[in-house]
Curated annotation (Swiss-Prot):
It comes from Viscum album. PROSITE patterns: THIONIN. One of its GO terms (molecular function) is toxin activity. It comes from the Eukaryota. It is found in: Secreted. It holds the Pfam family Thionin. PANTHER family: THIONIN-2.1-RELATED. Residues 1-26 form the signal peptide. SUPFAM superfamilies: Crambin-like. This is Viscotoxin-A3. Belongs to the plant thionin (TC 1.C.44) family. The lineage of its organism: Eukaryota, Viridiplantae, Streptophyta, Embryophyta, Tracheophyta. The gene is THI2.1. One of its GO terms (cellular component) is extracellular region.
Length: 111
């Protein structure tokens, strides 16, 4: 009984390790929030990554950095989510914050 439990535990650890490695190996980069939402909804149906990427306009990469044609979006999105999300001073303030992020990230495309 103890041998069965031990081998089951080893098998479980190996399967979890394989799952984590496959999660780390590939990443999707999407050009906008709509594309990300389409990709995520597609993946929830169980469709393969390449199919969902093609449908949504996203790219599957093996590294950790998105392609050079995506940086402005990620700069703006990161700025807005970290700086503007906690803004509780109304819509006008939120618009000013988002505009500032857009201006800050404007030169990223030229880099």
């Amino acid at each position: 009984m103890e041998v069965v439990r031990g081998s089951s535990l080893v098998l479980l650890v190996l399967l979890l390790g394989a799952l984590l490695v496959s999660q780390v190996e590939s990443k999707s980069c999407c050009p906008n929030t709509t594309g990300r939402n389409i990709y995520n909804a597609c993946r929830l149906t169980g469709a393969p990554r390449p199919t969902c990427a093609k449908l949504s306009g996203c790219k599957i990469i093996s590294g950790s950095t998105c392609p050079s044609d995506y940086p402005k979006f990620y700069c703006t999105l990161g700025c807005e989510s970290s700086q503007c999300a906690t803004n509780s001073n109304g819509d006008a303030e939120a618009v000013r914050c988002k505009t500032a992020c857009s201006d800050l990230c404007q030169d990223v495309d030229d880099a």
